[in-house]
Amino acid sequence: MAAKLKKGDKVIVLAGKDKGKTGSISSVDPKSGKAIVDGINIAIRATRQSQTEQGGRIPKAMPIDLSNLAYVDANGKATRVGFKMEGDKKVRFAKTTGDVIDA
């Protein structure tokens, strides 16, 4: 199935401890159906010091399920994403406004 949410999309969290927060997707794992969103679902990870990195308690963005994310449209509201054909090209569009997301 085609990816409705992609890297770089601005999304809002629908459920969980960060409900209502917005952020940009930094990576998507389609196999597990999860995405990493900047500044969302932060966990503290203890890491050992190495020659290149400082050790200690480092905040890290953890994956969040794609079903708990919604695309943010031009109005700043959460919307579902659909697909339609424009000419011979398949494009994503916001279902609330009908605007094409990626032309």
From Swiss-Prot:
Keyword Nucleotidyltransferase: no
InterPro entries: KOW, Rib_uL2_dom2, Ribosomal_uL24, Ribosomal_uL24_CS, Ribosomal_uL24_KOW, Translation_prot_SH3-like_sf
Alphabetically ordered keywords of this record: Ribonucleoprotein, Ribosomal protein, RNA-binding, rRNA-binding
Source species, domain of life: Bacteria
MF terms (GO), sorted A to Z: rRNA binding; structural constituent of ribosome
PANTHER family given in the database record: MITOCHONDRIAL RIBOSOMAL PROTEIN L24
Subunit structure and binding partners: Part of the 50S ribosomal subunit.
Cellular component, GO annotation: ribonucleoprotein complex; ribosome
SUPFAM superfamilies: Translation proteins SH3-like domain
Family to which the UniProt record says this protein belongs: Belongs to the universal ribosomal protein uL24 family.
Protein name (record): Large ribosomal subunit protein uL24
The keyword Transit peptide is assigned to this record: no
Protein role: One of two assembly initiator proteins, it binds directly to the 5'-end of the 23S rRNA, where it nucleates assembly of the 50S subunit. One of the proteins that surrounds the polypeptide exit tunnel on the outside of the subunit.
Swiss-Prot/TrEMBL GO biological process terms: translation
